[in-house]
Amino acid sequence: MLHRVKLLTGLQELSDAQLFLYFLATSMSKVFIDGEAGTTGLQIRERLALMPAVQVVSIDPVKRKDPEAKRELMAGVDMVILCLHDDHARESVAMIDSLTGQKPKIIDASTAHRVEPGWVYGFPELAAGQRDAVVNAERVANPGCYATGAIALLRPLIDAGLVPADFPVALPSVSGYSGGGRTMIEDFEAGKAPLFEAYALGLEHKHIPEIMAYTGLTRRPLFVPSVGNFRQGMLVQLPIHLDMLPGKPKAMDLHHALAKHYGQSPDGWVSVQPATDNGKLDATALNDTNKLEIRVFANETHRHAVLMARLDNLGKGASGAAVQNLQLMLGV
């Protein structure tokens, strides 16, 4: 009681400007970015710096590897965003699990929890109810960049019955080199990397499990990623022989199904756009945004179509998606 009286007396002595700053500070959501020095962490921090309702809390660099200091910091924030390798992300989650009392909400940008029970997949546009699931979630797994594009293309078509769950899907894709981590970034920026390079040609990639889990595919897709000599930007492609689909739909049927699905999204980050007149698509046009655009290119004479998802691999494919999920989870 005495503490409350002293607090009220102190507040009465503050100017209007000081009162505003006091109440702003006490109402701000505190966020700790575990791994803020990496590419995704830095971008998240930059985006959060523009949000007056969020305060980013950082650990003393000297204590960065001190588990007790980290545990104490985590206990005092509203949310922890994990921008770590998978094993370290699991360690941080275990540390949060060990806390007593109110635990912070978690967004994990690693691959570690994307198909794990108890985690909500952080693509609010996935299906009806997914946005509300993110709003009410304690733990959200941020999607992978390629997976975001692939799921955005496939899930509405599978739900609509236009593409069978066992359809043989191919997903040739290209990303800017920032998606490859620090070593790839350094190689490209030092001129040590080729202008264009296909990779993961052993046909194993960490995004395939989440692509299957959240599209509903029962047949493993043929995913062929590549990297170009540009820092950021992404195209995920879905080529289709239309006559191989049940009922032999027209390309416009695919367009309409996608437009119907994403037209119901209240946030407007994912949209279906007309095919470009020149038959070209720039992978970098959505850089530094949280947007994802879908287009259906087609040649009905040959009954061919290629569906394209364009996004910033560091935006809707990483940090932009994390901030979108944070806003939904914290209501800021």
Positions of the model-derived regions?
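C-terminal substrate-binding/catalytic lobe of Rossmann-fold NAD(P)-dependent oxidoreductases
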Residues: T39-R71, C83, P168-S173, Y177-L307
